[in-house]
Amino acid sequence: MSDNILEIFATSYMWLLEHMFLINVVFSFLIIFFQRKNPTTVWAWLLLLYFIPILGFLLYMILGQNFRKERMFKMKEIEGEIKYAVRRQEESIYRKKLRLRDPELERFKSLILYNLNEGEAVLTDNNDIRIYTDGREKFNALLNEMDHARNYIHIQYYIIRSDELWKEIEEVLLRKARQGVEIRILFDSMGCRGRKGMHKADWDRLRKAGIQVAEFFPAVLGKLQLRVNYRNHRKIAVIDGRIGFVGGFNVGREYLGKDRKFGYWRDTHICIEGSAVTSLAVRFVLDWNYAAGENLFLEDRLFALPEYVRGGKDPVQIISSGPDSSSQEIRDNYLRLIHMAQRSIYIQTPYFVPDEGLMTALK
């Protein structure tokens, strides 16, 4: 019996070696012609396939695939007033009827129109913006706004640590849930894993309290992640459709500057009060619908702007991009802004891996 197994294995191995060249050619054609990638990326994958046959293609299937064509979140789900607002604003721009309060924004009309066409991003100019660069200040503001929630709280983070900061947030969420406030938490499967991350017992405790929880891209087998480069890094909080938070701070003690390894954590988060919050509400619902298998677009109350919104005069256009986008709206916005620069360009980022297009624009 064992001799037969060894013979089958040897035969299969020899067949694989004999056909290795043909298999690599087929895989190479798949990489070149079935995925749109820049030449540098294509060459990198082809070299990997050449030096590590077959295994290289398996790595490509896990790390290199472009899932954009799958349209995971399908923007066509956005109906009603949002679609109408996009079309109406496009007409205003085409007919030069759009009046911007800030004359400086006149030269950005082409960019505004691009964002409308590509990302259905409506421009609103009745917003009040607050900027936070300190984690403690940001989370104090978030906790305060959640404590004043009347109808719903939606929060979405890539990383949530089960530590003292989360305990502060959880305490408010549990209290608001008892008061009848509808609460949804969306977390990324990979970002919340690990020894310091959230565990099943943590989520179960929230669910028992009536809080809805959804996991983005859950692991297939235990900790196996097949889409490691398609994580949800968004950090969004929307309260009553009235106020929204978006930016770079995740939930963890290190973001408060309490981790010796990282020291003081400098990041940027903004708080929006005004009509632009609707765009954040839509973005959350798109991600939630995909992760939870629901259709919250049927619930108009999640997108209605409350009468008690204070608002302001700041113009805002929320640009959203990711594996669900057919084009790279955020990247293209940076490129266009760089090309439009007249005096100076300042870039501040912890992750600077410019592609060919960005390097050409900077030159």
Regions found by a protein language model. Name each.
Residues 1-336, 340:
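N-terminal localization/anchoring segments of enzymes in phospholipid and broader phosphate metabolism
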